[in-house]
Structure formats: structure tokens, C-alpha cells
Regions:
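Conserved donor NDP-sugar-binding/catalytic core segment of glycosyltransferases
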Residues: 1-23
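Hydrophobic residues within well-ordered alpha-helices
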Residues: 66-67
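Short, well-ordered alpha-helical scaffold segment located
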Residues: 41-43, 80
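A recurrent flexible, glycine/aromatic-enriched loop bordering the glycosyltransferase active site
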Residues: 21-38, 97-103
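Non-catalytic, C-terminal membrane-associated alpha-helical segments of glycosyltransferases
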Residues: 121-170
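Catalytic core of nucleotide-sugar-dependent glycosyltransferases
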Residues: 91-127, 169
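Active-site donor/metal-binding and catalytic loop motifs
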Residues: 76-99
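Acidic donor-binding loop at a coil-to-helix junction in glycosyltransferase catalytic cores
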Residues: 55-62
Length: 170
């Protein structure tokens, strides 16, 4: 942090047999909590949002809070710190989520949707919705486009509902 004059840095954090793609110091678009260094004074202005607990997005949300404070995140290719995977714990034990038993499963995950609601403009959210629609069309059992659209819309609305429930609790 001192050497580069930046308040937040992340380093290369490979798993076994993963090779380095970026070999230069660059401005990094995301934040990963597993191998980041943050100036202590910034930690008084941001926090982990518990609405993201057990889902995807807690690191990205934390990083957006930093970015909204005007902070840049630098990627440092060195030091290289090996990312070891624990044999148990973390996401290896699947938590029971409030929407797990819903007949219509939300798509995307409500925590992903929450991140989009918090940080994207309405136009960007619509764009994301459209990209996701086309991305999953070929992977669904519905080959009739209208039937797929109607089902997708239900799943999307379910995701928005649960994301707003999470948002209300945060």
C-alpha cells in the first residue's frame, strides 16, 4: 500500500496449476476478499453486507462500497500467494436458503440480483436481464420461445422478490 500509494491492492492468488495471465500492475475491476489489502481507515467507512451471506456477491459488494468512496483497486502480480482449498467448510456445506423450497426457483440467484439492484442503473439491469435470457435459452428444456419467456419471467420476478427481501433486512 505504501509502495504504490494506493489504499487497496489485491495480489495474484492462484490455485494449483493455475497460470498467471496479468503480469503487470493494473487497475482491477473487482474486489476479492480472500487476498486483498485494505488501508485500515477505509474499513471504518465500509462493511460486509449480511444480505449476501451464504450467496454470491459479498466481495463484489464490499468492493463497490470502496469504489463509491472513490478508491481504486490495484492488482499486483507479486507477491504470488497460493490459494489452498480447505477439505471441508465454507460452501462445501450447502446452507438452506429461504427460497430453496419455492416451486419457482429464482434466476439469477437473489444475491446476484441484489448486487445488480444496488449498483446498476435500471437500463443496465434490463440489459443484464436480456443477456441472461439469451444465455440460458439453449440450456433450458423449453424450446418453445414463448413458453421459455413466460417461465423465465416468473423466475426473474421471483429473484427480484427475494433480492428485495434481502435488501429490506440489510
Amino acid at each position: 500500500i505504501k509502495k504504490f500509494g494506493n489504499e487497496v491492492v489485491i495480489t495474484f492468488y492462484p490455485q494449483k496449476r493455475e497460470s498467471k495471465v496479468f503480469k503487470e500492475i493494473i487497475q482491477w475491476p473487482t474486489f476479492g476478499g480472500g487476498n486483498s489489502f485494505v488501508k485500515r481507515t477505509l474499513l471504518e467507512k465500509v462493511k460486509f453486507n449480511m444480505a449476501f451471506e451464504f450467496g454470491y456477491g459479498e466481495d463484489a459488494d464490499f468492493g463497490m462500497q470502496l469504489r463509491n468512496q472513490g478508491v481504486d483497486i490495484l492488482y499486483l502480480p507479486n507477491p504470488e500467494i497460493l490459494h489452498l482449498k480447505a477439505p471441508m467448510g465454507g460452501f462445501r456445506t450447502k446452507p438452506v436458503l429461504a427460497w430453496d423450497k419455492d416451486s419457482i426457483q429464482p434466476k439469477p440467484s437473489p444475491t446476484v440480483q441484489l448486487y445488480k439492484i444496488l449498483y446498476l442503473s435500471p437500463e443496465q439491469q434490463k440489459g443484464y436481464q436480456m443477456v441472461l435470457f439469451f444465455k440460458y435459452y439453449s440450456k433450458q428444456s423449453f424450446k418453445n420461445p414463448l413458453r421459455y419467456y413466460l417461465n423465465y419471467r416468473k423466475q426473474w420476478n421471483q429473484s427480484v422478490f427475494w433480492a428485495n427481501q434481502l435488501k429490506a433486512k440489510s
